[in-house]
Design a protein with these regions (language model features):
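A short, acidic, amphipathic alpha-helical segment used as a generic capping/interface helix at domain edges
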Residues: 78-85
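Short S/T/G/P-rich N-terminal loop/turn motif that feeds into the first structured element of a domain
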Residues: 1-58, 65-76, 88-125
Length: 125
């Protein structure tokens, strides 16, 4: 569809890390991803990691069917042991939200100083 906002919210988190690559991959593959899967519902469409091994940087891409799905999952995982370990392993360099999060979620994540960009137009299949 042309210029039809389906309400999806995409979260792009650029990160850096100083831990070993093995420790980071172990966390992503065997702790965080399984935990997120266990806490998510049909509103989480993507939760994918991309790593540049040379620069020790990573990007976490999360795509939600709607803003409420983002808020529900964030509420379930924030403050958990897995989330605290994530915060120990990674430094958030930049967080960008594409779409419109709920007002209460904006307050919750304001400490991460996200850049929020509203939908303008394009093609949605």
């Amino acid at each position: 569809d042309l210029h039809k906002n389906k309400g999806q919210v995409t979260v792009v988190i650029d990160l850096s890390f100083s831990a070993s690559l093995d420790e980071v991959k172990e966390f992503i593959l065997n702790e965080q991803s399984p935990f997120i899967l266990s806490q998510s519902d049909e509103n989480l469409l993507k939760f994918e990691w991309f790593i540049d091994e040379d620069t020790k940087t990573a990007t976490l891409l999360e795509v939600f069917a709607n803003a409420e799905g983002f808020e529900v999952l964030a509420g379930k995982v924030m403050g958990t042991p897995v989330n605290l370990k994530f915060r120990d392993l990674f430094a958030v360099e930049k967080m960008t939200i594409l779409g419109e999060p709920t007002e209460s979620l904006k307050e919750t994540i304001s400490v991460m100083n996200p850049t929020i960009k509203k939908y303008t137009g394009g093609i949605n299949q």
